[in-house]
Amino acid sequence: MTWLVIRVRANQGVERSIKDTMGHLNLTRVNHAVLIPESDTYAGMLKKSKDYVTWGEVTAEAVAELIRERGRLLGDKPVSDADVKAETEHKSIAAFAAAIASGEATVKDMPSLKRVFRMHPPRGAKGWGGIKRAFTIGGALGNRGSAITDLAHRML
C-alpha cells in the first residue's frame, strides 16, 4: 500500500523537530503532496507531524490522475505515457500508478519525476474544513483513510 500525504498547515510556530520531519518527507510548503510507501518508519514520521499534515491510503486510479494532472518532470514539463515508458519498465502512467499504489514501485523509480506534487487548495464550499482539528471531528488533519482520494480530487 501507498500513502498520499498532503501538507495542510504552514511553518509558523512549528517545533524544529517537526519541521525537520516534514522536510524529510519533502513537504516544505502548504498544499504540497507526496506518495510514500507504507512502513513503520514513515508511520512514525506521520505520527510526529500529524498536527500539520493529512494522509490516507490511495488507489491506483487516484495515483494515475495525480501523476497526469500534477506530476512534473525536471524542467517543469508534464508527464506523458512516453516518458514513463522510456524511464521505467511500465508501459503507461496507469501501469506505473498501479505499481505505486500496490507498493511494488515508488516515485523514485522514475528519476526525472519530481517527488512533490504541487496541489491547488481544496475547491468547493467546505475547503479544508478547519485546519486546526482532526479529520475525525470534522477538521482536516491526521489520517483520513480512503477519504484522501476525495480531497486529492478536489485539489487537482
Task: Show the residue positions of the predicted features.
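Core subunits and conserved enzymes of cellular information-processing
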Residues: 1-156
